[in-house]
Amino acid sequence: MAENLAGNDRLIWIDLEMTGLDTDRDSIIEIATIVTDAQLNVLAEGPELAIAHPLETLEAMDEWNRNQHRRSGLWQRVIDSQVTHAQAEAQTVAFLSEWIRAGASPMCGNSICQDRRFLHRQMSRLERYFHYRNLDVSTIKELARRWAPTVANGFAKSSAHTALSDVRDSIDELRHYRQFMGALGGDTAAGVEN
């Protein structure tokens, strides 16, 4: 698929579900990726993988995570999974390498710095596949909340808290904000090319 690697403006979107937010103690339990073009059109969805963990690890999560991951079905998927962190990382890198060269895309998503911290510790090869820059939709959301609350309030996530649904939400959320960005959104009348 070498012809697929031609576009340098492709974006890799990622989301992780974890046992908690402590990057030193908690663990990745699900990963999903999507590749889009620069205009946020989905080109391909990567593997959506629940990562095997013992029941004791899940039971040690805080109440919010236990309830959320049971409700979403992720709890059972993790228990049933045979996929290790190393296998999830290898499958994800293999998928990405079909669509975009290493180092070409920023890491894209919501609160992506947290995901990067977990990847650095548990899937460092995948973390290095991304450019060092981040495209964090949460930054735009925080600015809109402060400067244009009606814009921020105009988008509602599905809040399923599964990795793939969260990736889709992040892309949809950026599409929402893009319509309010004028020339930054590709307004050719303002002399900006797409």
Curated annotation (Swiss-Prot):
<keyword id="KW-0378">Hydrolase</keyword>
<dbReference type="GO" id="GO:0000175">
    <property type="term" value="F:3'-5'-RNA exonuclease activity"/>
</dbReference>
<protein>
    <recommendedName>
        <fullName>Oligoribonuclease</fullName>
        <ecNumber>3.1.15.-</ecNumber>
    </recommendedName>
</protein>
<feature type="active site">
    <location>
        <position position="132"/>
    </location>
</feature>
<dbReference type="GO" id="GO:0003676">
    <property type="term" value="F:nucleic acid binding"/>
</dbReference>
<dbReference type="InterPro" id="IPR013520">
    <property type="entry name" value="Exonuclease_RNaseT/DNA_pol3"/>
</dbReference>
<dbReference type="GO" id="GO:0006259">
    <property type="term" value="P:DNA metabolic process"/>
</dbReference>
<dbReference type="InterPro" id="IPR012337">
    <property type="entry name" value="RNaseH-like_sf"/>
</dbReference>
<keyword id="KW-0540">Nuclease</keyword>
<feature type="domain" description="Exonuclease">
    <location>
        <begin position="11"/>
        <end position="174"/>
    </location>
</feature>
<keyword id="KW-0269">Exonuclease</keyword>
<dbReference type="Pfam" id="PF00929">
    <property type="entry name" value="RNase_T"/>
</dbReference>
<comment type="function">
    <text>3'-to-5' exoribonuclease specific for small oligoribonucleotides.</text>
</comment>
<keyword id="KW-0963">Cytoplasm</keyword>
<dbReference type="InterPro" id="IPR036397">
    <property type="entry name" value="RNaseH_sf"/>
</dbReference>
<dbReference type="GO" id="GO:0005737">
    <property type="term" value="C:cytoplasm"/>
</dbReference>
<comment type="similarity">
    <text>Belongs to the oligoribonuclease family.</text>
</comment>
<dbReference type="InterPro" id="IPR022894">
    <property type="entry name" value="Oligoribonuclease"/>
</dbReference>
